[in-house]
UniProtKB/Swiss-Prot annotation:
Its EC number is 2.4.2.31. It is found in: Sarcoplasmic reticulum membrane. NAD(+) binds at residues 121, 179, 233. It holds the Pfam family ART. SUPFAM superfamilies: ADP-ribosylation (SSF56399). The gene is ART1. InterPro entries: ADP-ribosyltransferase_ARG, ART. GO terms for molecular function: NAD+ poly-ADP-ribosyltransferase activity; NAD+-protein-arginine ADP-ribosyltransferase activity; nucleotidyltransferase activity. This is GPI-linked NAD(P)(+)--arginine ADP-ribosyltransferase 1. Has ADP-ribosyltransferase activity toward GLP1R. Residues 73-273 form the TR mART core domain. Disulfide bonds join 53-277, 174-224. Belongs to the Arg-specific ADP-ribosyltransferase family.
Length: 327
């Protein structure tokens, strides 16, 4: 019964691809100097979900954070800027920044340091770029993470913040988002390939806002683990959604013209992590037994029901509706 629907989806995808390829693009500095990189499962990414060790990580944060401040000036400066902004916003009360929307109260367990971490990540500072570059390489080995990754605190706080903010969604709430990337032209894998984004990926509910982040690669994404962080972003007008590095996607369609941006369309599949609670294992589990949940290290896929719902959504509105600013 799904054959006609799948056929329609394929035809629609092919039509979108032909429309994209038919367009001409001017050669710009972006096209000449952007780097190329494959889009794959990002095997070197550090993807810890901290399943079963969140409380232990929280207890370790004061010492760990101080240590990282001493060796990582970019992180220390970014955290100081975000802390100042958090204090100002807290003093303003429920209306933050330029937004006139009254924010809902934060979820249970959400602490000031979660808010500061989100502000630090979204600020217009060198921190975002250096942090994600480090995340993409920190998982090359456990030793590399333990000895050379000086963003352990920020990685944990961002991961836990997204888990807490997404907890009220009950079942995964999937949404269409857009992501523009500057300086990287991804080499898309073929349709049907499973991929990850390799780091914490900022996207927007608005395609025009996403283009401001860059147009070397432009993604259209159906995400089920990405969480809206508008109220906790330095720039709430961007309607930002933050996607964790362990979410997996299926490539639905892709184009990589000789000139102009690569365009890649992804649909959520589930999540996969190679690491879990690595810092706690190193600090606490050598001298005494630790009982940690290792379930996060296995591949988890969306349920069949949610996969079908995603397919229906694609068929209902098209993978990525053509609107001004997208094509």
């Amino acid at each position: 019964m799904w054959v006609p629907a799948v056929a329609n989806l394929l035809l629609l995808s092919l039509g979108l691809l032909e429309a994209i390829q038919a367009q001409s693009h001017l050669v710009t500095r972006r096209d000449l100097f952007s780097q190329e990189t494959p889009l794959d499962m990002a095997p070197a990414s550090f993807d810890d979900q901290y399943v079963g060790c969140a409380a232990a990580m929280t207890a370790a944060l004061p010492h760990l954070n101080l240590t990282e401040f001493q060796v990582n000036k970019v992180y220390a400066d970014g955290w100081a800027l975000a802390s100042s902004q958090w204090r100002e916003r807290s003093a303003w009360g429920p209306e933050w920044g330029l937004s006139t929307t009254r924010l809902p109260p934060p979820p249970a367990g959400f602490r000031d340091e979660h808010g500061v971490a989100l502000l630090a990540y979204t600020a217009n500072s060198p921190l975002h770029k250096e942090f994600n570059a480090a995340v993409r390489q920190a998982g090359r080995s456990r030793a590399h993470y333990l000895q050379h990754f000086s963003f352990k605190t920020l990685h944990f706080l961002l991961t836990e913040a997204l888990q807490l903010l997404g907890r009220d969604q009950r079942m995964p709430r999937c949404r269409q988002v857009f992501r523009g990337v500057h300086g990287l032209r991804f080499r898309p894998a073929g349709p049907g390939t499973t991929v990850r984004l390799g780091g914490f990926a900022s996207a927007s509910l608005k395609n025009v806002a996403a283009q401001q982040f860059g147009e070397d690669t432009f993604f259209g994404i159906w995400t089920c683990l990405g969480v809206p962080i508008q109220g906790y972003s330095f720039f709430p007008g961007e309607e930002e959604v933050l996607i964790p590095p362990f979410e997996t996607f299926q490539v639905i369609n892709a184009s990589r013209p000789a000139q102009g941006p690569a365009r890649i369309y992804l649909k959520a599949l589930g999540k996969r992590s190679s690491y879990n609670c690595e810092y706690i294992k190193e600090m606490q589990c050598k001298s005494r037994p630790c009982h940690l949940d290792n379930s996060a290290s296995a591949q988890e896929r969306l349920s069949t029901a949610w996969s079908l719902l995603l397919l229906l959504a694609f068929l209902a509105v098209g993978p990525f509706p053509g609107s001004p600013g997208l094509f």
